[in-house]
From Swiss-Prot:
Its cofactor is NADP(+). SUPFAM superfamilies: NAD(P)-binding Rossmann-fold domains (SSF51735). It catalyses: GDP-alpha-D-mannose = GDP-4-dehydro-alpha-D-rhamnose + H2O. The keyword NAD does not apply. Keywords: Lipopolysaccharide biosynthesis, Lyase, NADP. The keyword Lyase applies. This is GDP-mannose 4,6-dehydratase. Pathway: Bacterial outer membrane biogenesis; LPS O-antigen biosynthesis; Nucleotide-sugar biosynthesis; GDP-L-fucose biosynthesis via de novo pathway; GDP-L-fucose from GDP-alpha-D-mannose: step 1/2. Belongs to the NAD(P)-dependent epimerase/dehydratase family. GDP-mannose 4,6-dehydratase subfamily.
Length: 344
């Protein structure tokens, strides 16, 4: 039986990847961060918590001895590092914590692999936020990086140290530069899920208005469940490499808001510009969307769009779910949750 470690298993990607690996017959050592309020709702929603081959562990990625202990205990063939302080906005208020987890944590895991068994295959979750102030459109594996947040900078360290260990110690280290990928399991601190959850509440008359920051920000959004398949495929190749996973389509936050309201049959029209822009229900005249400057970031990333042609050519991977389908899927899940009186 193949064995894998998945760090960050309580998150969106970690939960989907754990499910995928279990379905493929793996024994999975799934880790989550020590905290006062551990929440494994995603694991529960996918109905895998009691799977006989899933082993859940509290784990501190910032502690080197914990990394060595985990790798020694699990003796994995594959390690997927998805653990991170992964919210861009929080990284501005918690830059040191972000660096410790998202940057140095990668080094700790790679060192543990180098010491215990350099033949272990390693996947590092890199991000399109490393491109930041984009130098090329669309972005590929060869596009220069220009991160615009402490999160992007920390992820760039994790990316480069993975490549460094690949070249220095012959470790099978793959880096997946994943563009934004969403799902019903996305956290509400991320803009797409904030939108779908709030629009669901508006549709159910539980909330009156959605407040957002930069409506002009453009992102390449895909379906997270498809992206974890790409992660797995990277580690099945004969040679380690770096791959972009994306949809090669970009839409504004405003576009996603419009899709969300369309999914619940509420007619919406935007008026005004900048901080004065509003979204109005054309049937009732109610203001349903407002811009709040508090949600603007100190340094914005304006445009991300990825070219996944290398992943398609080598891995046979490509996105299948359209953004409209994804938005509808998320809205429907949030409506059901809010009808039941809860929303994670």
């Amino acid at each position: 039986m193949k064995t894998a470690i998945v760090t960050g298993a309580s998150g969106q990607d970690g939960a989907y990847l754990s499910q995928l690996l279990l379905d493929k017959g793996y024994k999975v050592y799934a880790t989550y961060r020590r905290s006062s309020s551990v929440n494994l709702w995603r694991i529960d929603e996918l109905n895998i918590r009691n799977h006989p081959n899933l082993h859940l562990f509290e784990f501190d990625l910032t502690d080197m001895s914990s990394c060595i202990s985990l790798v020694t205990k699990a003796q994995p063939g594959e390690v997927y590092n998805l653990a991170a302080q992964s919210f861009v906005g929080v990284s501005f208020s918690q830059p040191v914590t972000t660096a410790e987890i998202t940057a140095i944590g990668v080094l700790n895991l790679l060192e543990a692999i180098r010491i215990i068994n350099p033949k272990i295959k390693f996947y590092q979750a890199s991000t399109s936020e490393m491109f930041g102030k984009v130098q090329q459109i669309p972005q590929t594996e060869k596009t220069p990086f220009y991160p615009r947040s402490p999160y992007g900078v920390a992820k760039l360290y994790g990316h480069w140290i993975t490549l460094n260990y690949r070249e220095s110690y012959d470790i099978f280290g793959c880096s997946g530069i994943l563009f934004n990928h969403e799902s019903p399991l996305r956290g509400r601190e991320f803009v797409t899920r904030k939108i779908t959850d709030t629009v669901a509440k508006i549709a159910l008359n539980k909330q009156s208005c959605l407040e957002l920051g930069n409506l002009d920000a453009k992102r390449d959004w895909g379906f997270a469940k498809e992206y974890v398949e790409g992660m797995w495929r990277m580690l099945q190749e004969d040679q380690p490499d770096t791959y972009v996973l994306a949809t090669n389509r970009t839409e504004t936050v405003r576009d996603f808001v419009a899709m969300a309201f369309q999914a619940v049959n509420i007619p919406l029209e935007f008026n005004g510009k900048g901080e004065n822009e509003i979204g109005v229900n054309t049937d009732t005249g109610d203001v349903l969307v407002r811009v709040n400057k508090e949600y603007y970031r100190p340094a914005e990333v304006d445009l991300l769009i990825g070219d996944y042609s290398k992943a398609k050519r080598i891995l046979g991977w490509e996105p299948k779910t359209s953004l409209e389908e994804l938005c509808k899927m998320m809205i429907e899940a949030d409506i059901e949750r809010n009808k039941l009186g809860f929303s994670f």
